[in-house]
């Protein structure tokens, strides 16, 4: 059709269409992505790209589970990142999200998890909407991923408590290339890119919804960000910053004078 927008699949039909973008935000589309190309996404990430994907975009990392499409996840993704389950989920109430404070597969501190907890504490995001003190309220959780101790490439950031389906990974990240070799001096691998998977709907919090049925700007309320939005804000800041190993504490920013 003349003058019609290009198909969204044209974005990922070749790596050169992805490389102009610093970050890709893949927001849930209500089903597994049609005709995705995980291999091209991996090429983009391995070259230093960043990806934030939510809910049904798990199919980029796991391959399609329920849609019976033909594309597959790269061999070093899939079950190397997490244990995956398909579907949309039907839990729209608030559950508690536990901030992960230790590195996956060890008892060593996860410095960025500690920073996330401090951020959420300082912004008043924890213990809201009836969840336990020190936990993040999560509306519309979706239970598609579990990062286990054998999933060495991945780091869980927030895990569901027993008020929902306990032990499900609500946020996790992994650096790329997944199989990057350690440096010659035995230090951390030279990672280039980073991906974050968010298994929830940020807009699920009722406080984010416009119920006035009026057009902007009259319907725009000057209210605080929801707890989930504050967590999202932190994750986007981290995603867009320099890639440093999860074992390293994030540097302290220098205030602009």
Language-model regions: role of each:
Residues 1-70:
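Helical hinge/lid and interdomain linker segments adjacent to catalytic or ligand-binding clefts
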Residues 13-14, 110, 226, 257:
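Intrinsic-disorder/low-complexity, polar/charged segments
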Residues 24, 40, 46-54, 115, ...:
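A glycine-centered loop/beta-turn motif at secondary-structure junctions
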Residues 53, 57-168, 177:
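An acidic, glycine-rich "communication" segment
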Residues 63-65, 69, 213, 250-253:
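Generic alpha-helical propensity signal that fires on short helical segments
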Residues 241-257:
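Alpha/beta-hydrolase-fold serine-hydrolase catalytic core, especially in secreted/extracellular enzymes
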